[in-house]
Amino acid sequence: MKKLFATLLVLMLEVSGLAMAEEDTSVENILEKGTFILGLDDSFPPMGFRDENNDIVGFDIDVAKEVAARLGVEFIAQPISWDAKELELASGTIDCIWNGMSITPEREESMAMTFPYLNNQMIFYTRADAGIDSLEALAGKSVAVQNGSYAEELLSGDYADLAATFSEVLGFDEYLTALMDLQNGGCDAVLMDLVVGDYRINGMGATDLKAAVALTDDNYGIGFRKEDIALRDKVEELLIEMKKDGTLEKISTQWFGSDITVVPAE
């Protein structure tokens, strides 16, 4: 009987130890260190970018700052290489990736993604006089994307057959450089986010460029480490709270002229 009791005690301690090892302390970790570090591509307006004073600003930045304030911690925006964002997150140098990031099956495999907070479309931008008004018209054309972007994933995955009809797919580190290349005739189209593309073109005063052909709908979400479910859930809870009290509407209206967020109200 004593031997049986000892065996059961060992098993109970092992199970208890395993449970403790798997306990999610991600929210407590943020509160203890006193900072909430957001990883972003700082050339992705209006979600996150550098203003004329070199300060990092944007819609996502304003929302994340409010989340950090409600957590009672300091907000830090940490620029990262978008092509290595998953490595930056896994290494622990940032707490989340929050920068107009599309929700994809691949990203849901490697990260704990939030619910969508903003709807978007992936659009081919062309020169206004190019006469490209359909996907078929892109055959034989050169198309630019940002390295590590959802656009790149689409053309190498679900839309690989379409990409095979292009003369080439060009990779750029920043969309601004890609749009300037398009303007100068270096490529025939740029596949990018509608929200970002329209903002960039308006800011450039590029009346010679236009949103020509839509490829697919898209949703933005926030990515956390797979084990940080509690932190992901807490941020979702705060976003819902901000939707209810009108804070999200206020921030969205400042950047987009109206509330285009899709955060659930409960």
Predicted feature residues:
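Extracytoplasmic small-molecule ligand-binding "clamshell" domains
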Residues: E22-G100, D245
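Ligand-binding cleft/hinge of the Venus flytrap
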Residues: A64-V73, A151-G171, I201-G205
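Short helix-initiation/N-cap motifs at beta->coil->alpha
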Residues: I76-L87, V169-N184, T216-D218
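A ligand-binding cleft/hinge motif common to bilobed small-molecule-binding domains
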Residues: A84, M101-E109, L154-Y159, M180-N184, ...
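Short beta-strand-centered segments that line the small-molecule binding cleft or hinge
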Residues: E86-G100, E108-Q121, A211
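Flexible hinge/capping segments at coil-to-helix
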Residues: T126-V143
